[in-house]
């Protein structure tokens, strides 16, 4: 009987390992540089110094609940969780505005005395952790990635400003870990969906979210999870940079034909963010060539070419060219930290258009030019 039980457990163990490797593939990436970095004090993600872009931030403390509900379609408007995700960037900007202007010091006090308790309460009440999908509707997991991206930056800000009170950080990490787990398509909370059901824009958003969450908490498991997602898309980039997934690719027209280039822009932007986090801990992808001869910077170079070509722009919404309208351009701040040449026409365009609001309208990394005024 004991021998039989041993054999049975061995089979189960092998099966689990096989399934894990089938799902992820055998992870042959060398994470030694990440392990070393996580054993020491990691650098801050951004500068977090008050500047002219730190204006207009508001302490949004809207009460929500644990339900993360979908809309009927991808074009039905923003989810409540999206508005919640915006609150982190607003709060950081408000604090830094108070730091930048001595006559607005009350903004810092309100941040500490009002917003932080609100956020801790949100963590205790597990905001947006119970997923409610609508058939054919927008992805609720995607909104959890958005929360994790902005929450990660917020936590990095708090860490580097030494603003935590006893027990606050632990409560928020516990909540964030639930968001992380339930954002996986194959989690039981997501109605039988599978990881391979994700579109490239979803994979790239997960890559940025998981790598950031792993970075700020020095959690190697979660960082690896995100890095595998980054690799999934990074490996697709050819030597000429023509990523072509949502634009002229297999996912073209899945939502609206006119959104193809806009979605390609958001997808590649999230890959830039993920690549940046990797670069901070020695995992190179921004300029490093993959087996096809492609890299992140090559994909962005090509994106810049087509985004400034009138023939390629025909029939496209062009919202990714308009900082005041789009929700996916704040990654330009991160890009300029990695490449300061300004040779890319799309990057150069956003350097000019962001002078007014500093990406205050973006869904992720909103107020990015406030949290890191990347130009020296």
Predicted features by range, described:
Residues 76-283, 293:
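Aromatic-lined, polymer-binding surfaces characteristic
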Residues 287-303:
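Short secondary-structure subsegments characteristic of cysteine-rich extracellular domains
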Residues 4-13:
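Sec-dependent N-terminal signal peptides
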Residues 21-40, 44, 273, 277, ...:
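Terminal, non-catalytic domain-edge segments
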Residues 16-20:
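Sec/Tat signal peptide C-region and signal peptidase I cleavage site
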Residues 21-78:
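Low-complexity, Ser/Thr/Pro/Gly-enriched N-terminal "stalk/linker" regions
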Residues 13-14, 208:
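Short intrinsically disordered, low-complexity coil segments enriched in acidic
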């Amino acid at each position: 009987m004991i021998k039989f039980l041993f054999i049975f457990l061995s089979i189960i163990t092998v099966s689990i390992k096989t399934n894990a490797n089938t799902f992820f593939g055998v992870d042959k990436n060398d994470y030694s540089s990440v392990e070393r970095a996580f054993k020491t004090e990691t650098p801050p993600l951004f500068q977090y110094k008050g500047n002219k872009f730190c204006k207009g931030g508001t302490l949004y403390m809207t009460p929500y609940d644990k339900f993360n509900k979908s809309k009927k379609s991808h074009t039905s408007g923003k989810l409540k969780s999206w508005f919640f995700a915006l609150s982190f960037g607003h709060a950081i900007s408000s604090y830094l505005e108070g730091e930048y202007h001595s006559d607005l010091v009350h903004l810092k006090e309100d941040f500490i005395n009002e917003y932080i308790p609100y956020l801790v309460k949100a963590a205790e009440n597990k905001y947006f952790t119970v997923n409610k999908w609508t058939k054919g509707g927008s992805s609720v997991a995607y909104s959890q990635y958005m929360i994790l991206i902005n929450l990660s930056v917020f936590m990095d800000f708090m860490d580097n400003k030494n603003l935590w009170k006893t027990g606050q950080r632990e409560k928020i990490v516990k909540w964030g870990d639930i968001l992380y787990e339930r954002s996986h398509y194959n989690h039981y909370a997501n109605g039988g969906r599978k990881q391979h059901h994700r579109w490239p824009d979803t994979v790239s958003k997960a890559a940025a979210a998981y790598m950031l969450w792993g970075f700020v908490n020095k959690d190697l498991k979660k960082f690896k999870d995100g890095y595998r997602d980054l690799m999934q898309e990074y490996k697709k980039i050819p030597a000429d940079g023509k990523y072509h997934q949502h634009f002229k690719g297999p996912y073209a027209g899945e939502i609206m034909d006119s959104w193809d280039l806009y979605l390609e822009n958001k997808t590649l932007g999230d890959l830039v963010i993920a690549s940046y986090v990797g670069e901070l801990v020695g995992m190179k992808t921004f300029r490093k060539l993959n087996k096809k001869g492609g890299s992140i910077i090559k994909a962005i170079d090509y994106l810049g070419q087509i985004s400034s070509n009138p023939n390629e722009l025909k029939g496209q919404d062009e919202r990714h060219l308009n900082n005041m309208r789009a929700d996916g351009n704040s990654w330009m701040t991160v890009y300029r930290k990695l490449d300061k040449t300004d040779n890319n026409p799309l990057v150069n365009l956003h350097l000019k258009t962001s002078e007014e609001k500093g990406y205050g309208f973006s869904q992720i990394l909103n107020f990015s030019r406030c949290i890191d005024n990347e130009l020296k």
